[in-house]
């Protein structure tokens, strides 16, 4: 409660609260009291209860409604930036990349000069190292924990946009299911996710490139400082918690 008024907080996660999978899955979650997101979630549950058939979402991106149009807009923005000779970057972390339409969007972005990094744990139907995908790299991490988070980064002219949610880029997720994605609005949380993606892209112990034959090629280079992303990010989060605790004590 906030000054005798009810304060509603919602949780949006890339996974669920399961006592078994929580021990082995690596997920990301957001607790928020942002009124716009809270209201969007309320609308979403009304959709699930069949009380609303044509919902209007202000912040939340929901499959079968506004998710795909917004993804195309975000990719299109990066394409326009690249064509204008400005920095254009996309980083997409997910479990699976299979939808032909969205793969074509990424090919178009690559051809326009957008630098794209994909972190895909499972099935990936995009083929790198081709003339139409020369600006796309695919990383796969297989380590102690199952990589389960879906986090999407768009450079957006130096004002990064971060999104997090449940859908992979598969036809079943984008066209048939109800899946939700939230923007990350808090700048500190944005930076944490950006740092997570950066650490994962530096992994040279448990990560591999996916080549044009869709085979895994280990990144290991004896001349580079070893980085094991899952453990490095764990230490990173511990340092964030210690910093927060020290700041609270001052």
PLM features per residue range, with description:
Residues 2-11, 243-248:
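Conserved small/polar residues in nucleotide/adenosyl-binding loops
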Residues 25, 87-89, 115, 133-136, ...:
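Active-site lining segments that contact anionic ligands and/or coordinate catalytic metals
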Residues 5, 10-72, 76, 160-166, ...:
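Signature of lipid phosphatidyltransferase scaffolds
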Residues 1-5, 13-35, 119-154:
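HKD-type phospholipase D/PLD-like phosphodiesterase module
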Residues 233-235:
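Intrinsically disordered, low-complexity eukaryotic regions enriched in glycine, serine
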Residues 74-137:
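Primarily the HKD phosphodiesterase
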Residues 9, 78-85, 106-117, 146, ...:
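Proline/glycine-anchored alpha-helix kink/cap motifs
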